[in-house]
Amino acid sequence: MKVTLIAFLTCAAVLVLHTTAAEELEAESQLMGVGMPDTELAAVDEERLFECSVSCEIEKEGNKDCKKKKCKGGWKCKSNMCVKV
């Protein structure tokens, strides 16, 4: 009987700790989404620039006019580069 009680209390304690940690992690991720550090923004900018340039170059190789790939999140393709709208 004591073993069952100890096991039950241990599981309850682990569950409480896990739930608390998950709530803290969720709160941190929401804060990070609101104010992203400059290093993360720079990485996103470089990635969008690369994707846009590569997309336009691939389309130019087919001897057709470059139909620029839509850049997402308030960005547009201009001169083979993604620029903020």
Swiss-Prot record:
Endpoints of the signal sequence: 1-22
List S-S links within the chain: 52-66, 56-77, 71-82
Proregion residues are 23-48
UniProt subcellular location: Secreted
**UniProt keyword annotation of Secreted present:** yes
In terms of domain of life, where is this protein from? Answer: Eukaryota
Provide GO CC annotations from the record.
extracellular region; host cell postsynaptic membrane
In its keyword annotation, does this UniProt entry include Signal? yes
One Pfam family per UniProt: Toxin_20
Chief place of localization: secreted
A single Gene Ontology MF term assigned here is: toxin activity
**InterPro entries hit by this protein:** Hwtx-2-like (IPR012625)
Record's keyword terms, sorted: Disulfide bond, Neurotoxin, Postsynaptic neurotoxin, Secreted, Signal, Toxin
UniProt family annotation? Belongs to the neurotoxin 12 (Hwtx-2) family. 02 (Hwtx-2) subfamily.
Protein name per the record: U4-theraphotoxin-Hhn1l
